[in-house]
From Swiss-Prot:
InterPro entries: Aspartic_peptidase_AS, Clan_AA_Asp_peptidase_C, Peptidase_aspartic_dom_sf, Retropepsin-like_bacterial. This is Uncharacterized protein RP867. One of its GO terms (biological process) is proteolysis. It comes from Rickettsia prowazekii (strain Madrid E). The chain crosses the membrane at residues 6-26, 39-59, 66-86.
Amino acid sequence: MNKRLIKLIFIVCSTVIVTGVLYKYINQNYPKFFKESQNIVSFYALLLLLFSIIYSTFSRKEIRRFCFQLAMWAVIFLVIITGYAFRFELHYAYHRVISALIPSYKWSTEVGEIIIARSGDGHFYINACVNNVKIKFMVDTGASDIALTKEDAQKLGFDLNKLKYTRTYLTANGENKAAPIILNSVVIGTEFKNIKGHVGLGNLDISLLGMSLLERFKGFRIDKDLLILNY
């Protein structure tokens, strides 16, 4: 950037600052000044005179170059401001795109909210930390409590031979005997303690996340292909 262009920028910036100060001074000390059309015309005529001096001082090429650079910076500034103003919407849009690419994708928001995308088979899946062990669940609002597969129960340290299968649960495949258990800690976004669950004699393909945990959230809802949990 040559010296003449730097000088041009300095003069334009100075003109803008002086104009702003002058406008504020007049508006504060003479509140009725800008209510009269004649005074407004005079004020803008002064601005026109200032810019005319600038145009007469510099060549058209330098003016065009300055205006182009000024426009570029204005666009950059506008993009930054727009991105900041719509940062939450952009954050949501980003995760929606990822959820379309990755089935059962889960993300958290800043307001204590977990959002889970529906998988291709129509179900919602979520990973939870149960007693410090990672377990994958399928969300089942029809299940009264958490149902663990035999494999997951063993991961958590339960001895299947010592469990008491004293309860009867109704499943899609009929009645099933199960042993009631208590899960000391389940972490999904936040920690929930003493959650009711059971281990059945039947063969589950995947552990089920039932109402004994879902009802501990502040709220949950299904919005189209999203499961939204609030904690």
